[in-house]
Amino acid sequence: MKPDAHHVKQFLLRLQDDICQTLSAVDGANFVEDSWRREAGGGGRSRVLRNGGIFEQAGVNFSHVHGDAMPASATAHRPELAGRSFEAMGVSLVVHPHNPYIPTSHANVRFFIAEKPGADPVWWFGGGFDLTPYYGFEEDAVHWHRTARDLCQPFGDDVYPRYKKWCDDYFFLKHRNEQRGIGGLFFDDLNTPDFDHCFAFMQAVGNGYTEAYLPIVERRKAMVWGERERNFQLYRRGRYVEFNLVWDRGTLFGLQTGGRTESILMSMPPLVRWEYDWQPEAGSPEAALSEFIQVRDWI
């Protein structure tokens, strides 16, 4: 089947609706929608839930941008895209909970297609999801990765280990020499064996996010926390900010190509703190995190 951008867009719009409805049902608060248009072509729907019962901030963004030509920064490494019209669409989300015992989660699924008359379209899918705990619980990590493995299984035995490794490699803070969290799945440039297969996998990843995350939220939401745990959560959120602003390709591409800044930075935590050369107390739960987020096989 030839690539069908309209079909992908309809799925992404439904996915945004489904995820927002699911998170609202768990939290009790509602998302506020901010629809926006891009002068050069396209637009999107940014939805944010603030100060809910469970989530301090959750942002779920849909965007669909298009144009007659790719920006030079995008074609420098992909000369085959020069002179083609393009469409790029996706859903991206980040959830920052109040409770430090609930991890932060991130997910993204996206589709890109570039076309010109008389030539085959250039297209691919990308996406994934990853988990950033502040306090490590092995059963949560096992559930997260088992859900990822199970959704990958119908697409081949090698899919989960390959995209798990890609996720571990991608969400790494080189300047800190540490992982951002415990990973999950990450894939990009997916266009084989055919459109239907790739689209089905992207849908499985998008639909699998809430199955992976919500049981962890339910398991941890009643745990009691205080100032110590909150301060550690805010400190570790600093790593999240550092990764997004220094290393994340999507954030950098969006800011460098005139994307909508409010939507791009929607992933940022609402509160964060840095402390010079802070070290956790030896033997404390906070000190245990650095070992917990080391790359390993969870299942």
Swiss-Prot record:
<dbReference type="GO" id="GO:0004109">
    <property type="term" value="F:coproporphyrinogen oxidase activity"/>
</dbReference>
<feature type="region of interest" description="Important for dimerization">
    <location>
        <begin position="240"/>
        <end position="275"/>
    </location>
</feature>
<keyword id="KW-0560">Oxidoreductase</keyword>
<dbReference type="GO" id="GO:0042803">
    <property type="term" value="F:protein homodimerization activity"/>
</dbReference>
<feature type="binding site">
    <location>
        <begin position="258"/>
        <end position="260"/>
    </location>
    <ligand>
        <name>substrate</name>
    </ligand>
</feature>
<feature type="binding site">
    <location>
        <position position="145"/>
    </location>
    <ligand>
        <name>a divalent metal cation</name>
    </ligand>
</feature>
<dbReference type="GO" id="GO:0005737">
    <property type="term" value="C:cytoplasm"/>
</dbReference>
<feature type="binding site">
    <location>
        <position position="175"/>
    </location>
    <ligand>
        <name>a divalent metal cation</name>
    </ligand>
</feature>
<feature type="site" description="Important for dimerization">
    <location>
        <position position="175"/>
    </location>
</feature>
<feature type="binding site">
    <location>
        <position position="92"/>
    </location>
    <ligand>
        <name>substrate</name>
    </ligand>
</feature>
<protein>
    <recommendedName>
        <fullName>Oxygen-dependent coproporphyrinogen-III oxidase</fullName>
        <ecNumber>1.3.3.3</ecNumber>
    </recommendedName>
</protein>
<dbReference type="InterPro" id="IPR018375">
    <property type="entry name" value="Coprogen_oxidase_CS"/>
</dbReference>
<feature type="binding site">
    <location>
        <begin position="108"/>
        <end position="110"/>
    </location>
    <ligand>
        <name>substrate</name>
    </ligand>
</feature>
<comment type="subunit">
    <text>Homodimer.</text>
</comment>
<feature type="binding site">
    <location>
        <position position="96"/>
    </location>
    <ligand>
        <name>a divalent metal cation</name>
    </ligand>
</feature>
<dbReference type="InterPro" id="IPR036406">
    <property type="entry name" value="Coprogen_oxidase_aer_sf"/>
</dbReference>
<dbReference type="InterPro" id="IPR001260">
    <property type="entry name" value="Coprogen_oxidase_aer"/>
</dbReference>
<keyword id="KW-0627">Porphyrin biosynthesis</keyword>
<dbReference type="Pfam" id="PF01218">
    <property type="entry name" value="Coprogen_oxidas"/>
</dbReference>
<keyword id="KW-0963">Cytoplasm</keyword>
<dbReference type="GO" id="GO:0046872">
    <property type="term" value="F:metal ion binding"/>
</dbReference>
<feature type="binding site">
    <location>
        <position position="106"/>
    </location>
    <ligand>
        <name>a divalent metal cation</name>
    </ligand>
</feature>
<keyword id="KW-0479">Metal-binding</keyword>
<comment type="function">
    <text>Involved in the heme biosynthesis. Catalyzes the aerobic oxidative decarboxylation of propionate groups of rings A and B of coproporphyrinogen-III to yield the vinyl groups in protoporphyrinogen-IX.</text>
</comment>
<keyword id="KW-0350">Heme biosynthesis</keyword>
<dbReference type="GO" id="GO:0006782">
    <property type="term" value="P:protoporphyrinogen IX biosynthetic process"/>
</dbReference>
<feature type="active site" description="Proton donor">
    <location>
        <position position="106"/>
    </location>
</feature>
<comment type="similarity">
    <text>Belongs to the aerobic coproporphyrinogen-III oxidase family.</text>
</comment>
<comment type="pathway">
    <text>Porphyrin-containing compound metabolism; protoporphyrin-IX biosynthesis; protoporphyrinogen-IX from coproporphyrinogen-III (O2 route): step 1/1.</text>
</comment>
